[in-house]
A protein has these predicted regions:
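Structural/interface elements that position substrates and couple domains in central-metabolism enzymes
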Residues: 16, 22-51, 63
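Glycine-rich phosphate/nucleotide-binding loop
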Residues: 189-280
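N-terminal glycine-rich phosphate/adenylate-binding segment common to multiple enzyme folds
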Residues: 45-116, 203, 207
Length: 315
């Protein structure tokens, strides 16, 4: 039986990225109830938002296993009491809670400018070209339009969309349009058709978790995740070794276990342990090590059990 995992990602006070309305919370929780696998919330600790979240969570399902990761230590401190309050009242089941400090490592793709592309971004750009080429090829076969979701304000996103325009060229039956994260939320709530293609850059956690909460079928494959109408080209653009913060690796670690994808799990887990280890030295948050070990042990269980059963059958 799959574990139910509620992923809460706490951001600094970036109001434009906060899920502000009650309808958004309810829509995501409704999808979580349907799939029983995954959900996504961003936490705003303002009094109004707290009241709405407490009310909604109290009336929501019992959560068998919630894994909470923080991308920002200041936000983590602010939100800790709120999360404890909510989960203490919502569920009596055991849940894992902890804090992953942002890694000092930084992916340079997040600072790409149109007029200043460093040599270190060449690899990323080549991956973008591959992903775009693959997406356009698929669009030609199925004769559908492309919707590209990127970070609208980042240089990397502009490069991605420019590459799409170039690749499409004279293909008159294919068009590309651009949406940002706020519009993606509306797609997940059913207000707009879901994108045909989603390209992510450095914000894996915000993008992938929102998408996973919206998928009708479990993703499959290694370099692409397939759904009935959506392809998420993640691996091509964002190799695991270039993940920019521990929260992103944490997300990959969690849903890799849910999807029982050993390859993803090992890549994300290895990176997370290495990255967070650097953060320990800088922030002296050594208590995180025990928590991280507990999380890895916990989410590894279904994979280990499955292997043991497989070996037994061979004997």
């Amino acid at each position: 039986m799959n574990k139910r995992i509620l992923f809460l990602y706490s951001l600094p006070k970036q109001k434009s990225q906060i899920l502000r309305c009650e309808a958004a919370f309810k829509a995501i929780l409704r999808k979580f109830r349907q799939t029983g696998i995954f959900s996504y919330l961003q936490i705003d600790t303002s009094p109004t938002c707290r009241e709405k979240m407490v009310e909604i969570l109290k009336s929501s399902i019992k959560i068998s296993n919630a894994v909470i990761f923080y991308g920002d230590i200041q936000s983590a401190n602010q939100d800790a009491l709120f999360i404890k309050e909510v989960f203490g009242e919502v569920t009596q089941e055991r849940f894992l809670a902890g804090r992953c400090i942002c890694s000092p490592l930084c992916d340079e793709i997040s600072s790409i400018k149109d007029d200043a592309i460093s040599e270190s971004t060449v690899y990323h750009l080549s991956q973008i070209k591959k992903a775009v080429s693959l997406a356009v090829s698929e669009a030609k076969k199925k004769k559908h339009n492309l919707t590209v979701c990127t970070q609208s304000e980042s240089g990397a996103s502009r490069l991605i969309f420019r590459e799409f325009e170039y690749a499409l060229g004279k293909e008159r039956h294919i068009s590309a349009s651009h949406i940002d994260f706020d519009e993606m939320l509306l797609c997940s709530m059913g207000h707009y058709p879901f994108p045909d293609v989603v390209l992510t850059t450095q914000a894996i956690s915000r993008t992938a978790s929102l998408l996973l909460a919206s998928l009708q079928k479990m993703p499959t494959g290694y370099s692409c995740w397939h759904t009935e109408s959506t392809k998420i080209y993640l691996r091509e653009i964002f190799p695991f070794e270039q993940i920019s913060c521990a929260a992103d690796a944490s997300l990959l670690l969690v849903f890799s276990a849910v999807l029982k994808n050993e390859l993803f799990l090992k890549s994300a887990g290895d990176w997370l342990k290495r990255s967070v280890s650097l953060a320990y030295e800088k922030c002296e948050q050594t208590h995180c090590a025990a928590f991280l070990d507990e999380v890895i042990c916990e989410i590894n269980k279904p994979i280990r059990n499955r292997k043991e059963k497989h070996n037994d059958s061979e004997d």
